Structures are given as C-alpha cells and as structure tokens.
Amino acid sequence: MAGFIGKERHALDEKGRLMIPVRFRRELSPESTGRGSTIYLMKAPDGSIELYEPDIWEGMKKSLAVLSDFNPEERLLKTMIYESLDVVAIDRQGRVPFSREFLEHAGIVRDVVIIGADTKMIVWAPERLSLLVMENAERYSSLARRYF
C-alpha cells in the first residue's frame, strides 16, 4: 500500500455519509473494500475525525493493550481513546456513515476536507482546518526545520 496522500474536498450526503474519494479508495486494502468491510473512526483531540483501516487499528490496539489499567494516566488514555472510537461499515458505494456525535465533535455541517496522512485519513470541517493552518503557520515552519 502506498498510503493515503493528498487532500480532497467533499460534501456529506443528506444522511451524514462521506463518500471516500476515489484516490483514497484505491489505497484501501482488499479487506476494506469488500462486502461487510469496516473502518474505524476516532474523534481526534484536535477536533478532526480520523479514519483507520482495521489492520492499522489492530497495530494501535496492541500498543494500547500493554498499558496498565492500574496506572491512572495509562488508564485515562485508554478510556479517552476508546470513548472516542467507533467502527462502521463502508457501504458498496464507498460511503462511511458519521453519527451526530462525531459530526458535532468536528463541527461538520456538510462540507469536509479529507487529508490523506499515510496510514489514515483525517476529516476536517473546512473552516476549522483553515483556522488551524493560519494560526500555526510559524509553528509549522519551526517544526519542519526541527524534524526535516
């Protein structure tokens, strides 16, 4: 898999479903494109919604499994992640349904921007993404110099 790369603008349909862009559907694993395929949705702390294929989520789940329920910080992290997680079916047309809870979390009414971020897709309300980019332009420059 080459990974999800790029940015697409789309609109949810009247039932709150997102059509996965063709360029991203091509990158889905065969297990994620057949009948009964699923995708994991997570309400990200930054106000976006992240979409993970099952095989990617399984790797993340293993990382969470080693955290101790007896360590308050680790237990809190697990609770917060699992509270923000859902698994939904991708329909035959490649649509992903979003619950009202997820749409409200992200401030999404109809239009969205989908960013391919290698192993995941990140869904933003356009206004929130524009504000994030504008408010963090200098910080981005500093981070890019530090890590690249």
Swiss-Prot record:
It is found in: Cytoplasm, Nucleoid. GO terms for cellular component: cytoplasm; nucleoid. The keyword Repeat applies. InterPro entries: MraZ (IPR003444), MraZ_C (IPR035644), MraZ_dom (IPR020603), MraZ_N (IPR035642), MraZ_sf (IPR038619), SpoVT-AbrB_dom (IPR007159), SpoVT-AbrB_sf (IPR037914). GO terms for molecular function: DNA-binding transcription factor activity; transcription cis-regulatory region binding. Its main location: cytoplasm. Residues 7-56, 85-128 form the SpoVT-AbrB domain. Gene3D superfamilies: Transcriptional regulator MraZ domain. Belongs to the MraZ family. Forms oligomers. This is Transcriptional regulator MraZ.
